[in-house]
Amino acid sequence: MFDFSIVTTAIDSLLRQTLGLGDFWSILIECVLVGVGILTAYALIAIALIFMERKVCAYFQCRLGPMRVGPWGIFQVFADVLKMLIKEIFVVDRADKMLYYIAPFLVIIASVGTFSFLPWNMGAHILDFNVGLFLITAISSIGVLGVFLAGWGSNNKYSVVSAMRGAVQMISYEMSLGLCLISAVVLTGTMQVSGIVEAQVGPWSWLIIKGHVPAILAFLVFLVAGNAEANRGPFDLAEAESELTAGYHTEYSGMGFGFYYLAEYLNLFVISGIASTVFLGGWAPLNIGVEGFDNLMNLIPGFIWFFGKTFAVEWILMWVRWTFPRLRIDQILTLEWKYLMPLSLIILVLMTVCVALGFHG
């Protein structure tokens, strides 16, 4: 399988040896290239997911979705982006301007920060620390501040109610989310994201297979908790149109609203990417111990495996959104604290016992 670190090493060698640049300028140029790459990937993935969700929604509602702008409506998203870019950005009367302007950037920082930890190919990861999973959960928590400050700074009672709902929901479901990730850490013995993927290379080595029933349950709980963490249906109580207009970003227009819209879909990608990385092997191919089959699977590039698994998980989450009705706030919190939280603790105990007794792999 192709190792992307060859490309990064070649770029570094080009800057330092061929062009003769010093350490400062080499690192600066590399950081600029990485930043441009992140923003480009951010925009393209968000556009692809918006188009995908419109088509998935249309499929479940027995219609065609956008078909006018471009073939099969593929340019509809670009038209919407253009419209959003030229809209005026204004602040409502008596709003807290500092909080109002800071909030969208906090949401973007949280989504881009967690996105940077995803390894999409062997040797292709922007950030890779030995406590990677811990940092992912820590950085994602910044999004709670962005949601709450947006509602509080807008000087709108509906936005405040929405922000409080969203903050309570996101903080609650972080517990189950973290416990499911700890179960994976117990099984692999590392919190480094690249190390977790490397532990799943080999025949029948994906955690959802190697971890048996506890890993399968952890994967399912992670999907439910991740869906709630991203404020996606049926957990989209913070944006309940029939109750709160548009939720915590009611008073935002132009790219202020656009930041929240983009962050929602990138958070969906991050949740799906973490699920595929931790439980489904990430860029690791499916190997079953048959030489011919394994060699064929190894020919498929790692980024295709990663994006294929990630978009498959996203399709499942979109399916859930457009199938189930919205839950009430008491039902959402009851689901977490009475069912998912105890189940996550039981899964962690079972996983620990399986690893201690050698019943894994």
Question: Which role fits each region the language model picked out?
Answer:
Residues F2-G361:
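Selective transmembrane helix interface/packing segments
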